[in-house]
A protein has these predicted regions:
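Short, highly charged, low-complexity non-transmembrane loops/tails of multi-pass membrane proteins
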Residues: 1, 157-188
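Cytosolic juxtamembrane helix and N-cap/initiation of the first transmembrane helix
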Residues: 2-51
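Short juxtamembrane and helix-loop transition motifs at transmembrane-helix boundaries
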Residues: 34-41, 60-72, 98-102
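Generic alpha-helical transmembrane segments
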Residues: 47-53, 67-88, 111
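Membrane-helix interface motif
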Residues: 49-62, 120
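Loop-to-transmembrane helix junctions at the membrane interface
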Residues: 87-113
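Membrane-helix boundary connector in multi-pass membrane proteins
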Residues: 116-138
């Protein structure tokens, strides 16, 4: 994808036509199924990020000496900011930008590390004999499972076809813009 991204960025109209021919799909392309692996991965990433948030913010509020009943004052802005970053990267990935996909994969790795760290912390608390609410342990296991499902949905032939479709559409949009600029110059 990185090489095709560079070729699209520097290509003329005829070179873009060649790139689009390389990215032609065998059979019929269903545009509604094109982004499903990416959307599934994004939803699983969001769920995996959300799982450790209550325990994380309860710990922050406890250490800061703030009232525990206001913990959602930390959770809501944190998750909203994460959603903004996540959906920006997902949207740019769907538009065919290599750096956005790379950024999304880095974000996904960070979330997987957070979920794994939360699971290890909960297991350590459990084995040390601290009284834990079973919901926190279940949420830590679910966070790791969502991270694994997120990686798995990106490691499918459907996502590979989707990336080809994203790049094809980006090349088509750039070719259309170049054609439009050429037409406007010829009219002037």
């Amino acid at each position: 994808m990185k090489l095709l991204d560079a070729r699209i960025r520097q290509a003329s109209e005829s070179e873009l036509e060649a790139v689009m021919q390389e990215l032609v799909f065998p059979g019929v392309l269903n545009p509604f199924k094109l982004g499903l692996p990416l959307v599934l991965s994004m939803l699983c990433t969001l769920c995996s990020f959300a799982m450790p948030q209550p325990a994380l913010w309860m710990g922050i509020f406890y250490l800061a000496g703030w009232p525990g009943h206001a913990v959602f004052a930390g959770i809501v802005p944190g998750v909203l900011l994460f959603c903004l970053v996540l959906f920006t990267l997902g949207s740019l990935t769907a538009r065919g930008y290599w750096l956005a996909l790379r950024g999304y994969l880095i974000l996904l790795r960070c979330v997987a590390v957070l979920a794994t760290g939360y699971l290890l912390f909960m297991l350590a608390q459990l084995f040390l004999g601290h009284a834990l609410h079973p919901l926190f342990v279940a949420m830590s296991v679910a966070g790791v499972a969502f991270s694994a499902l997120s990686f798995t949905s990106l490691n499918t032939p459907g996502f590979e076809r989707a990336v080809n479709g994203f790049l094809h559409n980006r090349a088509w949009r750039k070719a259309w813009l170049l054609r439009r600029q050429q037409t406007q110059k010829s009219r002037s």
